[in-house]
Amino acid sequence: MTLSILVAHDLQRVIGFENQLPWHLPNDLKHVKKLSTGHTLVMGRKTFESIGKPLPNRRNVVLTSDTSFNVEGVDVIHSIEDIYQLPGHVFIFGGQTLFEEMIDKVDDMYITVIEGKFRGDTFFPPYTFEDWEVASSVEGKLDEKNTIPHTFLHLIRKK
């Protein structure tokens, strides 16, 4: 099993505001699709509700304490420990609480750094490059639909 974080955050580590992304960046959505298609996304219930439906062509797993939570096309787990039973490449997809629980346990992180400061009420936990090696850093292309500068980082935990 490979365990990764998949996240976009701004320069202040904002990841959301009122259960939505504070920015519109189609390049990041394509990046998520490219990385996670054919694999497993694990997210908290609020993150799932912000998306509104299972993402296609990948396994969608929702971690929730709500034992009555049931959505077609979604697998439900009720504890962090259940994540370790999932096969293949597993991406931790949010939100804040799940990231806080898992940042010290993942092998690597795929981070889209949004080069701006946005209003937010949910945040990605602090991390330092002392703990992570930059495997790749690619500037996102700007165009009429992608107007916010952004960088795609792949960080691997230092041994």
Swiss-Prot record:
It comes from the Bacteria. GO terms for molecular function: dihydrofolate reductase activity; NADP binding. One of its GO terms (biological process) is tetrahydrofolate biosynthetic process. Pathway: Cofactor biosynthesis; tetrahydrofolate biosynthesis; 5,6,7,8-tetrahydrofolate from 7,8-dihydrofolate: step 1/1. Substrate binds at L6, V7, D28, S50, R58, F93. Signal peptide: none annotated. It catalyses: (6S)-5,6,7,8-tetrahydrofolate + NADP(+) = 7,8-dihydrofolate + NADPH + H(+). Residues 2-157 form the DHFR domain. InterPro entries: DHFR (IPR012259), DHFR-like_dom_sf (IPR024072), DHFR_CS (IPR017925), DHFR_dom (IPR001796). NADP(+) binds at residues 7-8, 15-20, 44-47, 63-66, 93-98, 101, 122. Its EC number is 1.5.1.3. Keywords: NADP, One-carbon metabolism, Oxidoreductase. GO terms for cellular component: cytosol. Belongs to the dihydrofolate reductase family. There are two DhfR isozymes in S.aureus, this one is chromosomal and is sensitive to trimethoprim. Key enzyme in folate metabolism. Catalyzes an essential reaction for de novo glycine and purine synthesis, and for DNA precursor synthesis. This is Dihydrofolate reductase.
